[in-house]
Amino acid sequence: MSRIRLAARALRLALNRAHADPTADYDAASSDYDTFFSPVMGGHSTAALAEVPIAPGDRVVELACGTGHLTAEIIRRLDGKGSVRAIDKSPGMLDVARRKVEALTEGRPGLDVRLFVDDMDAFIRSQPDRSADLVVVGWAICYTKPTRLLAEIGRVLRPGGRIMVIETRADAHQALTEGLEKVFADDPSLLTSLIRVSLPKNAAAVAGWFGKAGLTVTGQRDGAQVIPAHTPAAVLEWVQRSGAAAGFKTAVDNGRQQLVLDRVEAALAELLAREGSLDIQHTFVVVTGAKPVAPRARHGARTGEEAGVA
């Protein structure tokens, strides 16, 4: 019965368009992100970026750049020549990224790197057709309507241009999310807005999004990383200070956030006592792709894209 009440509560919130905005949580996590998230998951991000070619002179767009972990790696691989347009909705995260970028671009006039506080969907819609060689989306496509965003990315990519997406999987932090669901099921009034995310089941699901958007998949894989937190208190600290729980503050009744955290911690303590360990996994997917090159027209005619016609 409690889960039915929770479902009814969620439906009412959805009908009223009560959606949690994760920006405040990312702002709060910005000073700790490179202490908690980047050392654990940053290596997976860098490995994913290595799966797409980047050459000096490339034009790169990075959506949701966060604290600039991948932005810095992109700049290094451009080797002194090229452009980067990186955006994030969180001013706090972008401030950290900007400091990294300034250190890497000083005295290198061949690099044109600009950072903007902006929404992913709005920014990509503002970009010209066929204006990017590579688009990178790290840990953030879940906050959009993925197929629609990917279709816009396809428009912005030049023919043959590449895309890399790394994203958290739907089964990540399973013990934690199950504990949170139980807390909300026991008292649905604690939930005041919905955290709207489209986390994929697996890499095949993201590959399906690519296909629907007209992009060719060049690689796909699933991965997992055990987070370095093995007590209930440490788990809760990691997910809050790493940004993994972004949206929590605005999703929970103001003034009862600590109550929710205490109840989740108790649920994790029960799991630890029952199982003997807390191995919380951050599962993720990596999918790379490309915009198909337009086939050559017969009899020597040029296609619209080859002729430069939008």
Where are these regions (language model features)?
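Conserved Class I S-adenosyl-L-methionine
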Residues: 2-18, 67-69, 198-310
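A short SAM/SAH-binding and catalytic strip from SAM-dependent methyltransferases
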Residues: 134-147
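Short glycine-dipeptide loop
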Residues: 80-81, 157-162
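Conserved class I S-adenosyl-L-methionine
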Residues: 2-56, 69-73, 93-96, 100-103
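A short acidic, Gly/Pro-enriched loop at the edge of an enzyme's catalytic core
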Residues: 125-135
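Conserved catalytic/acceptor-binding region of the Class I
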Residues: 148, 154, 162-230, 246
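A structural alpha-helix within SAM-dependent methyltransferase catalytic domains
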Residues: 49, 72-75, 150-154, 181
